[in-house]
Amino acid sequence: LGNVLDLGTPSDGTVTNAKLAQDIISGETALTDIPADTDELLLSDAGTLKRIDYSLMRAGTPSFRVYQSSAQSISNGTSTQVTLDSEDWDTDSAFASNTFTVPAGKAGKYIITACIRADASWAETEQFNVMIYRNGAVDTGAFVSNGINASHGNGACVSAVIDLAAADTIKLYIYHDEGGTEGLEAGQGNVFMSGIRIGA
């Protein structure tokens, strides 16, 4: 019967769902793995079609876990930032200079957890405070105060869900009133901080 008549490109907004084949999706190759961060999806944003990277939709990142590998000395009676010089992982390369900085596009609710352990040189002390700072202030609710027994090398842990905006910073601090300058028990399971984004 000859070639099908070429009517050109349809006008914008004239192709409706009724004109699409029912296998437009099911007939294509299925993606059987978790999408890559740069994979793109099409969605309707209040009626306007937009393209979005998968990285902006998934929870669970950024995430990080860092720890202290070299012992740090902590002065008496002053809040001191804890050195976290080694990484187990840092999915978005967002941890640097002992600080986690929320990447652009990754604002949301984060679970932040931290632990600090004293070494065995400490005398008994009433205040061994572990604090998570947001933007230079301890306003996150992530604060715990623990007593330390002499020569026992115990410590304290703290965890909180914190609402963070892009470019917000998270740091780990310690305060004690032992009376002198004392050391931390460095190590992967002794002095560490971790965080993970759990949602918007």
Language model features by range: what are they?
Residues 1-61, 106, 122-124, 135, ...:
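Extracellular repetitive beta-rich solenoid segments
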Residues 58-125, 134, 142-147, 180-200:
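Terminal (often C-terminal
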Residues 101-103, 160-165:
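Exposed beta-sheet edge/beta-hairpin loop segments within beta-rich domains
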Residues 112, 157-161:
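Beta-sandwich interaction modules
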Residues 130-136:
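Conserved aromatic beta-strand anchor motif in extracellular beta-sandwich/beta-rich domains
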Residues 168-170:
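Exposed beta-strand face motif in extracellular beta-rich ectodomains
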